[in-house]
Swiss-Prot record:
Compartments, as annotated in UniProt: Lysosome membrane; Late endosome
Protein name: Transmembrane protein 192
Family: Belongs to the TMEM192 family.
The species this protein was found in: Danio rerio (Zebrafish)
Main location, first listed in the record: membrane
Subunit structure: Homodimer.
Coiled coil start-end: none
Amino acid sequence: MVMESGRTSAYGNNTNVDFTQSTDDDPLIDGPLVSQDALESAIKREFQTLSTHWAVGVLSFLHVVYVVVCIVITVFCWISDEHTSECTAALNGIDSKTVVLLGKVALWVVVFIYDRVVQRRHSAVRRKGYLDFYRMTKGIKSLPLLIHSAGNAAILTVIAPSSLLDANVKNLSVYLLLAIICLELLLTIICLLRYTVHVVKFNRKKPHPDVTEEERSYGCSSDAHTETGFRDGSSLEDVVEKQADLIDYLKQHNSVLSRRILTLTGQQIRA
């Protein structure tokens, strides 16, 4: 019994020694602790504005220019025959209908590029933790591309039977084409204005990430919900989507914090 207790004691002592040595050999534990002020200054994130206003401005300008050009070409070169020679010289012999349709295709490409740029900027906002703003503008930021895609389908529907339409009413297809183009402009401008209002409010408010805002509201309110994402009237799909976004954001945020803590610790050890 004495020998067994001695072995047990020796084994326990060896375990303690090994644990102490492994702890002492760890440079992160043996090194100086990171001060709270240094850590907060290092992990503090400055708010970065969502700069999509230039894309909205470019799209709006090009869209207005296209509609004006279409109206001028349609009135002077398509409906009227008085300026046929001038139109032929100005368009280098290209048919006015072809110019309008090629311009529509080019405008759709511009709208598609705009949609990709805005989607990329909003994905960056989502990764930074502004999940409510991302979901609030998720639909409206994609409406211009949807409007122009539907407009293209409507234009094809009018152009294909244009001879039949013009046989019943003179230049009916031209008037319908202009109506579709002008309606596209009206709906697109409305969507862009609403989207711009949301972006301007977001940039002026300069909010913290949603996790930080909910922690503050929970700390100030005694009857706050204890689980992130649950609100009165929220559907299960919205709750699951928000919690999934929060998990992705927190994973990325934790990895960033870990790298910064290691960097600060290494700097203090070298100092």
